[in-house]
Amino acid sequence: MANTLYDRTIAFAGICQAVALVQQVARNGHCDQDAFETSMNAILNTNPANTIGVFGREADLKLGLECLVKGIDSTPSGSEITRYIISLMALERKLTARTDAMSQLGDRIQMAKRQTEHFELLEDQMISNLASIYLDVVSPIGPRIQVTGTPSVLQQTANQHKVRALLLSGIRSAVLWRQVGGKRRHLIFGRKKMVEQAQILLARM
């Protein structure tokens, strides 16, 4: 896959979309369904033709691109988004250093792909299956990502499954970010360029 500013922006928007949806689910118990479907599809799309192919079309990443442009700021909400992104990227670094875990993750995702022959992607059972991949393979590598929200919402099993499935999608995009040459310096020194690229993509939707 190409290592261009466009590719890095798309991959980073994928991370942003997953964490923006985590925030929505944790607070309200529901989220943007189209964006959620895109993020779930991204987990299973392991052999894309190009970077955008992981997600579908640019418009499918609208929420993530908007979050990239406006959602990462010093407000409490923005600080929470930033914390989730940093935590996911740290977890991805630990995960990719473990070939055993990466191999197990690949096997479990292939199994989940086969399960879509019997279940719709957004069915509770399928979301539960994706959540269990995160819980069994990714989470034990640590550090644990602390999700904050409305306690009564987060106590509901279906919402816990959605959050974990979304964190798995965030990991998928963090792996993609690294595959297209994304580095920490791009976040520190190159974020303005990614924001400008995201604004261009949003303007043509």
From Swiss-Prot:
Main location: cytoplasm
Topology in the lipid bilayer: Peripheral membrane protein
Record bears the keyword DNA-binding: no
Keywords from the named record: Cell inner membrane, Cell membrane, Cytoplasm, Membrane
Lineage: superkingdom: Bacteria
Entry annotated with the keyword Translocase: no
Family: Belongs to the HflD family.
Protein name: High frequency lysogenization protein HflD homolog
Organism encoding this protein: Vibrio parahaemolyticus serotype O3:K6 (strain RIMD 2210633)
